[in-house]
């Protein structure tokens, strides 16, 4: 297929998949500066710039091996903290940067091989300190520590007795945790210091929460917690749990939407709870439907939010303010003008654009993402998104079914680099929130139980049928593309319905559910009860092991005849490289067309820009070859 759209500029893979010029801005507590992420030696690092002065921005971290994605201002203007893992192994360490002495190297404050920091917090009642969970004693168990930021001294606060996913620290020194009871429910408990045991406060149905209690946040006085709960509701709502009595009180809810669930999977995304910078009071809650909805809980934040919404026709995304709640930095989600970041002064009403992450991308050259609803064969409505190429008749197009991971996640409106690249090549892109996706209510979530390779796959098949029936897609030129669970879905697509797809791209997808679940990292194993074991099965049960194998693409490898591109990070802690090796070897032994791209310095998702660029060059070339699209193969380029 030749590209006959002279007014649509051809976008290089690098235009969309390279690191942004700037992103991830957060204002300093005193409101005088802001930090952001920008490239240094081809890696995202933390930079700091004055908001009012003319002082030149300076880079304050120096990681030339792997991009920094998570950082934190502290209450001391001297220190900045950031988190970093080792080439994608998900063992995140906490590092300290001395902002007053740029010549001093960053210090690893948790220098324990194989250890992982989680549950990081900066309690306002303990200035100069951080509280964190660390599993260096036992990879499967996270103990609670207090960190003195200036000296690096770690003090054990509570030794986790097991069964608690993480411990949190209240202002009065009381500690709480949430873990699984014997029957799989989630138990919120208080740490009893004298006995070193946990005492139950209340429980939540485990099957309602495959990823645990999300969100979970102690109130500033430590006597309660704000929790996302389905109890007595079809949609998640914020409840206040009294940590003495266990009594629940509804704080906020939306009549038709769930709380935004995305930060539970991607912690770099904004939390659904918006807190006051100084008091830590709850001032707003994020919900998510076709578009994002923020409900303000205070008059001051409602006024601020009204003014912020005037800055863009996108959705309010990341937010930060100074301690007084007067100076704000806000970024916006937008399908064609992504991440535009503004400074807003509530005292004066002044605002200005700080930066666009991708200033070289013209919004007019990018394709809009449209919400659509698809009815599955059993009548279930599947909220979905359709991106169509610009200046091309939306009929008989090659199409890519782009499947989100998780499966306890969801697609949402906004800038999607994969969808934009594919639309630029002339493909229609369909993203389906199949049953089991989060954010669409309890019934929709639980409709995925036991349905891997079953009704969850049928939803994707029905979505392809919908696109063909609507006239958008050429049934002979449909590909499937996904990562993690989406990669599994791609493999299921070519093994369980081998005639449906003309090509498939699997990024870190598990071809063998039995071995994948047995090889889960130690830190994940205690919490499989309400996600993988409930939705798919427990490989330690012989009957369930047999069912898991029957739902595994590797069990039907003899049926695969579709061209396949497999992409894998060598350090993936969740889907080991040996998993992808299995299916690649089996297919090559049968003479099936399979391309295999492995990156030695990546894990379950790719972070470094050259690796993302290499993957998408490979996918661009591969899809152009098999769908006769407008990618690099059609353009005569090579990879």
Predicted segments with their positions:
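Hydrophobic/aromatic beta-strand patches that form the interior of the parallel beta-sheet core
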Residues: 131, 283, 372, 401, ...
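Active-site-proximal cap/loop segments of hydrolase catalytic domains
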Residues: 434-639
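Short hydrophobic segments within beta-strands
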Residues: 228, 387, 402-403, 481, ...
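Acidic helix/loop microenvironments that form the catalytic cleft of cell-wall polysaccharide enzymes
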Residues: 405-407, 485-486
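A fold-wide structural signal in alpha/beta-hydrolase
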Residues: 399, 423-433, 595
């Amino acid at each position: 297929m030749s590209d006959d759209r002279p007014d649509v500029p051809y976008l290089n893979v690098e235009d969309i998949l390279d690191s942004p010029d700037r992103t991830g801005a957060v204002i300093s507590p005193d409101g005088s500066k802001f930090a952001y992420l920008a490239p240094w030696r081809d890696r995202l690092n933390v930079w700091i710039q004055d908001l009012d002065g003319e002082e030149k921005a300076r880079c304050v971290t120096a990681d030339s091996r792997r991009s920094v994605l998570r950082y934190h201002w502290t209450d001391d203007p001297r220190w900045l903290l950031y988190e970093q893992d080792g080439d994608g192994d998900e063992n995140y360490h906490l590092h300290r940067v001395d902002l007053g002495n740029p010549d001093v190297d960053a210090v690893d404050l948790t220098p324990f091989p194989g250890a992982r920091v989680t549950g990081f917090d900066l309690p306002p009642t303990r200035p100069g300190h951080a509280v964190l969970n660390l599993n260096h004693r036992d990879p499967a168990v996270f103990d609670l520590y207090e960190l003195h930021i200036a000296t690096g001294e770690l003090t054990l606060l509570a030794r986790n007795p097991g069964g608690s996913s993480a411990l949190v620290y209240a202002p009065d020194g009381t500690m709480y945790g949430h873990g699984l009871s014997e029957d799989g429910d989630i138990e919120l408990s208080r740490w009893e210091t004298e006995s070193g045991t946990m005492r139950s406060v209340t429980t939540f149905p485990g099957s309602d929460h495959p990823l645990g209690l999300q969100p979970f946040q102690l109130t500033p006085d430590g006597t309660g917690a704000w929790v996302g709960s389905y109890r007595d509701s079809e949609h998640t709502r914020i409840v206040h749990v009294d940590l003495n009595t266990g009594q629940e009180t509804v704080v906020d809810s939306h009549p038709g939407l769930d709380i935004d669930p995305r930060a539970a999977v991607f912690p770099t995304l904004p939390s659904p709870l918006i807190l006051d910078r100084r008091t830590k009071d709850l001032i707003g809650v994020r919900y998510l439907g076709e578009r994002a909805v923020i409900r303000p809980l205070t008059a001051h934040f409602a006024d601020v939010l009204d003014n912020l919404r005037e800055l863009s026709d996108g959705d309010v995304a990341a937010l930060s303010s100074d301690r007084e709640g007067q100076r704000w930095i806000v970024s916006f989600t937008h399908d064609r003008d992504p991440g535009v970041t503004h400074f807003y002064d509530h005292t004066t009403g002044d605002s200005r654009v700080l930066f666009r992450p991708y200033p070289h991308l013209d919004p007019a050259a990018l394709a809009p993402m449209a919400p659509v609803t698809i009815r599955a064969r059993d009548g279930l409505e599947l909220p979905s998104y359709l991106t169509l190429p610009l200046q091309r008749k939306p009929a008989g197009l090659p199409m890519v079914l782009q499947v989100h991971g998780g499966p306890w996640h969801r697609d949402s409106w906004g800038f999607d680099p994969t969808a934009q690249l594919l639309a630029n090549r002339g493909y229609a892109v369909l993203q389906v929130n199949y049953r089991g996706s989060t954010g669409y209510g309890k019934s929709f979530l639980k409709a995925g139980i036991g349905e891997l390779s079953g009704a969850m796959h049928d939803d994707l098949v029905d979505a392809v049928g919908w696109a063909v029936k609507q006239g958008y897609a050429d049934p002979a030129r449909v590909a499937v593309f996904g990562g993690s669970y989406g990669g599994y879905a791609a493999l299921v697509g070519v093994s369980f319905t081998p005639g449906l797809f003309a090509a498939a791209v699997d990024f870190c997808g598990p071809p063998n559910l039995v071995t994948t679940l047995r090889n889960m990292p130690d830190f994940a194993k205690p919490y499989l009860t309400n996600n993988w074991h409930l939705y798919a099965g427990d490989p330690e049960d012989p009957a369930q092991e047999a069912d898991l194998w029957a739902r595994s693409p590797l069990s039907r490898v003899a049926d695969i005849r579709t061209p396949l591109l497999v992409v894998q990070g060598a350090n993936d802690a969740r889907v080991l490289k040996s998993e992808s090796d299995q299916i690649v070897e089996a297919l090559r032994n049968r003479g099936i067309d399979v391309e295999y791209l492995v990156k030695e310095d990546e894990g379950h998702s790719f972070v470094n820009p050259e690796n993302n660029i290499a993957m998408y060059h490979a996918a661009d070339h591969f899809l152009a070859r098999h769908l006769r699209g407008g990618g690099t193969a059609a353009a005569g380029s090579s990879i």
